A protein has these predicted regions:
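Propeptide-to-catalytic entry region of secreted or membrane-anchored zinc metalloproteases
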Residues: 11-130
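Sec-exported extracytoplasmic/periplasmic mature domains
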Residues: 72-81, 182-189, 241, 245
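The catalytic-center signature of Zn2+-dependent metalloproteases
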Residues: 163-235
């Protein structure tokens, strides 16, 4: 079974609608990586407001969200602080989901958009699975806009918390940090590479099999879990720092 951490483009960019008043979606409808510097630096945004939505009883573990916040605090210059709001929704009952259906769900439920000095991030934990899954592939998450990503929590739960699998918290953390890093511009998506480390055979991923941004299969995840949680390697960190990050 191959586990996929995906990158999709679902942008609707309109350069004439850049008013950032907290209710205008346009600045948050760009392609993945377009807001990399906005996340990493405090040149434009001094704060980050994260909205986490989950379906039914599929709430992410509290430790997962704490891990995410710690990860962001270690990499992003946000002197005004990072907040995370968690909200429950009813099942959209549309599984399997296409990326356009995920984007439609976001349009229905997202309440925060960029405003003044605060950048907004949308994270959705969905039931069901992704439409491109097959008998041998399973998608765990996808970044699909500059400030939007989805995690398929049913799939994550099916592959965690057994004696031979990673804990649910660890697997959620891997997926959410991986997708966030695509929005931070890794690799070569908006944070230019300082050294070539692009795995061109697998899209915008890192060639280092020990890096968080490696194109991951089940065996890769298991190997990394056996040796501890995966982290960003030196090349990925250099890219983020060169684009305004810590």
């Amino acid at each position: 079974m191959f586990l996929l951490l995906l990158l999709w483009s679902c942008s609707n960019e309109d350069n004439n609608s850049e008013v950032e008043n907290g209710t205008n979606p346009a600045p948050n409808l760009k392609s993945v990586g377009k807001s990399a510097n906005d996340f990493l630096s405090d040149d434009k945004y001094q704060s980050l407001a994260v909205e986490v939505f989950y379906v039914g009883n599929l709430q992410p573990n509290a430790q997962t969200l704490q891990n995410l916040k710690s990860f962001m605090e270690a990499r992003l210059h946000k002197p005004g602080g990072i907040t995370i709001a968690v909200k429950q929704i009813a099942s959209p009952a549309g599984t399997p989901y296409t990326i356009n259906e995920v984007a439609d769900i976001e349009s229905d439920i997202r309440t925060n958009y960029n405003r003044e000095d605060t950048l907004s991030l949308f994270i959705l934990f969905l039931d069901g699975n992704f439409s491109s899954d097959t008998g041998t592939t399973l998608t765990l998450g996808a970044a699909y806009r500059n400030t939007s990503c989805v995690l398929f929590e049913n799939s994550i739960q099916a592959l965690s918390n057994s004696p031979t699998e990673p804990s649910r918290t660890d697997l959620e953390t891997i997926v959410i940090e991986h997708e966030l890093c695509h929005m931070l511009g890794l690799v070569d998506l908006g944070s230019p590479m300082q050294t070539n480390h692009l795995d061109s055979a697998h899209g915008k991923h890192c060639i280092n099999p020990d890096c968080l941004m490696y194109y991951q299969t089940e065996s890769n995840i298991q190997n990394m879990m056996n040796s501890g949680m995966p982290t960003l390697d030196a090349n990925c960190l250099a890219d983020l720092q060169a684009n305004g990050g810590k």
